[in-house]
Structures are given as structure tokens and as C-alpha cells.
């Protein structure tokens, strides 16, 4: 029997629709990758043709961002809506991390690149399940509310540009999570929702690493091609990200993840010239 390549394992995750099943397979394939790494005989990376969009469950209904109902997070329904939005983000993140492996397998990269994104996909799978557990404890579930249809747009826009993918997904979208998660934690603390607080604290701590992986491999690729990382980052974010970056920024956590202020402040409305 021919051993499966890492890119084929990635596609198995991408083509699994149900969220719980997708994340279970993600955990399984991450364990397979790291077990092989420990033996000193890693799986072949291989090359594959991932789908433009990953398989998704029938629910939630995906709406234009402007049509997703706004709910105040101070109410129980608002807190459920906030958790539902986080679950949707985490499920997309699982697919985004497996997609970067599958889509760019033709680009020679050190094995550490795959270690980092498999680890990230594994952690995002855990995050999705933690948040789903919170939703279920509140009498809801993932799919019970409509969700944002634009989450995969960044992946489609950067499907042929690995530097663009690294710039927009971990270094912009996931970095935004570092800015907003402390406020979400406060919302659930005030409500005495300890399960949600615990889940969000896990997410907050581990997302720093995902942003750092993006920054690390973005800088690696720029260095390999003798490019200036800051200039390339500004160019690619202006090309692929729709609109200015929005402060306030969590400068401490961004710095921890290898993102200096001169990367993101020039891309705000006041600095975007």
C-alpha cells in the first residue's frame, strides 16, 4: 500500500464537510504527521490539487457580511451569537492551514514549515471543538445561526501567491484576533461564563503562535528572494486585503508574534497613503 502524502491528508480534511468530523480527521492527520517526524522518516509532502473551496456543512447559512444580524454581546443571545461567530472563524482557520499545505506543496520549503501549519491546524481544530462545546452547553450549536460568507475570500484571492497568503491570513486576519479577543474574554467574564472564558484564553494564547508562524515564513521567503519584508507586506496587503487595518492594535502580542508596528500602522486609514 502506498503511503499517503501530507498534501493528500490535507485534501481529506478539506473535503470533509461536517465540522466535528473535519476536526477529528485534522487531529488524526496531525498525529500521523508528527509520529512520522519522530521516527526520522517524515511523510512525503507530495503535490495535490485542492478544491477552490473546502467542503462545508449544510448549515450555517452563509450571508453577505452586511446581512449577518448584529446582536448585543451583553445579552445571552448576543453571547451565543459571538461564540457562533468564533466557531465559524475557527473552522475556517482549520481549512486555511490545511489549504496552505495542499495548495503550495509544489514550492520547496523546509520541513519546519509543514510542522508549523500542521500544528496550527491541530490547534484550530481544538479551538473549534472548545467553542462548539460552549455553544452546546448554552442550548445552541454551530449552524444554528447564519454566518459570514466572506471568510474564505482571502484564500481564493491568494490561491496562487504564497507570500500573499501568509501576509493576509496569519499576519492580518489572525493578528486581528489578538486585538479583539481580550475584549471578548471580558464580555464572558462579566457574564460569569467560565467555560467560554477558558476556551477563549486557550485560543488567545495559541493564536500568538499562528501569527508568529506567518511572520517567520513570510520573512524566510522574502529573505530567500532578497526582498524587503516590510515593503512586500505593504504591497501585498494593499493588493489582497479589502480596506484599511483598524486600530486599536494589541502591540504587545503582535510584537511577541514578530509583527513590528511599522508593518501595520502604515496600512491604517490615517497611514494608508
Regions found by a protein language model. Name each.
Residues 1-273:
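Non-heme di-metal
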Amino acid at each position: 500500500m502506498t503511503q499517503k502524502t501530507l498534501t493528500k491528508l490535507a485534501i481529506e480534511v478539506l473535503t470533509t464537510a461536517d465540522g466535528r468530523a473535519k476536526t477529528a480527521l485534522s487531529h488524526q492527520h496531525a498525529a500521523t504527521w508528527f509520529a512520522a517526524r519522530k521516527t526520522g522518516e517524515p511523510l512525503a509532502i507530495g503535490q495535490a490539487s485542492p478544491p477552490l473551496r473546502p467542503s462545508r456543512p449544510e448549515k450555517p447559512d452563509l450571508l453577505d457580511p452586511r446581512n449577518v444580524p448584529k446582536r448585543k454581546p451583553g445579552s445571552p443571545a448576543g453571547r451565543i451569537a459571538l461564540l457562533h461567530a468564533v466557531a465559524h472563524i475557527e473552522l475556517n482557520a482549520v481549512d486555511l492551514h490545511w489549504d496552505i499545505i495542499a495548495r503550495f506543496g509544489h514550492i520547496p520549503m523546509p520541513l519546519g514549515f509543514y510542522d508549523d501549519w500542521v500544528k496550527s491546524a491541530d490547534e484550530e481544530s481544538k479551538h473549534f471543538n472548545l467553542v462548539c462545546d460552549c455553544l452546546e452547553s448554552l442550548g445552541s450549536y454551530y449552524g444554528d445561526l447564519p454566518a459570514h460568507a466572506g471568510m474564505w475570500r482571502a484564500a481564493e484571492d491568494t490561491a496562487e501567491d504564497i507570500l500573499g497568503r501568509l501576509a493576509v491570513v496569519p499576519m492580518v486576519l489572525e493578528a486581528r484576533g489578538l486585538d479583539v479577543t481580550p475584549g471578548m474574554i471580558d464580555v464572558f467574564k462579566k457574564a460569569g461564563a467560565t467555560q467560554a472564558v477558558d476556551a477563549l484564553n486557550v485560543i488567545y494564547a495559541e493564536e500568538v503562535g499562528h501569527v508568529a508562524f506567518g511572520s517567520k515564513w513570510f520573512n524566510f521567503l522574502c529573505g530567500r528572494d532578497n526582498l524587503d519584508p516590510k515593503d512586500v507586506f505593504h504591497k501585498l496587503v494593499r493588493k489582497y486585503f479589502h480596506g484599511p487595518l483598524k486600530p486599536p492594535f494589541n502591540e504587545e502580542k503582535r510584537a511577541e508574534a514578530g509583527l513590528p508596528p511599522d508593518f501595520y500602522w502604515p496600512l491604517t486609514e490615517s497611514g494608508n497613503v
